[in-house]
């Protein structure tokens, strides 16, 4: 594989300790790809809100990622960023926030992830509407899908393409959907959209989702 400027910089400067371990890990990754192996990437925490998609999406398009294991937060927050990026609020001094400051953010429907606030109405509620429609249809038809498959269907349908606020090439989930990569999402229920699903199962108007929920789990 040809070396770009970043690889050249790292090989020139990253010689010892954890820096050297980074080089060794990258070389091992490269060797596995050259040998024809498939690579599963595990995404922890909320890296989608840290805009990991800028680099991750390109890796997926270049066939350097073949499967993904991620948190429910990573799954949904890539789509939140895709449709509501312009409404996000950054808090550089988040360590100095008082309880009053936190309450003010809550009152304005901002959900803080370290130094970045996700807007509830422009991101979460917009995606909720599209997902609920798909969940209800699946329950009515007796269809069973993994969590990521509902997002794949949403992204590939074009239903939200007119609402994109970033370059779609920076969405790793869209890139994964276009490749139909398998995604494992342990603990999906511990996410915003997972809680949306549970709340609609509990709501009287969506009692028919409960049978679908039982089959799903």
Annotate each language-model stretch with its function.
Residues 20-25, 29-30, 175-205:
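An interfacial alpha-helical scaffold signature
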Residues 46-59, 68:
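Thiamine diphosphate
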Residues 38-44, 68-70:
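Short glycine-rich or small-residue beta-strand-to-loop segments that form or flank ligand, phosphate
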Residues 207-216:
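Conserved small/polar residues in nucleotide/adenosyl-binding loops
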Residues 60-124:
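A generic, well-ordered mixed alpha/beta core segment in the N-terminal half of proteins
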Residues 101-192:
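Ligand-binding beta-strand-loop-alpha-helix segment within the catalytic cores
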Residues 1-26, 30-33:
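N-terminal glycine-rich anion-binding loop in soluble enzyme alpha/beta folds
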Residues 51-54, 79-85, 195-198:
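Short acidic, glycine/serine/threonine-rich loops at helix termini
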């Amino acid at each position: 594989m040809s070396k770009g400027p970043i690889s050249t910089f790292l090989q020139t400067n990253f010689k010892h300790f954890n820096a050297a371990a980074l080089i060794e890990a990258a070389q091992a990754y490269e060797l596995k790809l050259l040998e024809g192996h498939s690579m599963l990437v595990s995404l922890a925490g909320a890296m989608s809100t840290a805009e990991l998609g800028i680099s991750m999406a390109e890796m997926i398009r270049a066939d350097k990622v073949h499967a993904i294991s991620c948190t429910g937060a990573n799954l949904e927050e890539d789509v939140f960023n895709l449709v509501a990026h312009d409404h996000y609020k950054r808090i550089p001094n988040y360590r100095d926030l008082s309880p009053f400051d936190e309450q003010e953010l809550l009152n304005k429907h901002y959900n803080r992830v370290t130094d970045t606030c996700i807007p509830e109405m422009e991101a979460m509620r917009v995606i909720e509407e599209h997902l609920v429609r798909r969940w209800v249809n699946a329950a009515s038809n007796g269809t069973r899908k993994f969590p990521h498959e509902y997002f794949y269907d949403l992204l590939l349908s074009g239903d939200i393409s007119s609402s994109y606020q970033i370059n779609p090439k920076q969405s790793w989930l869209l890139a994964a959907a276009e490749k139909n990569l398998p995604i494992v999402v342990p603990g999906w229920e511990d996410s915003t959209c997972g809680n949306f699903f549970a709340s609609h199962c509990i709501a009287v108007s969506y009692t028919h989702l409960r049978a679908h929920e039982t089959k799903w789990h």
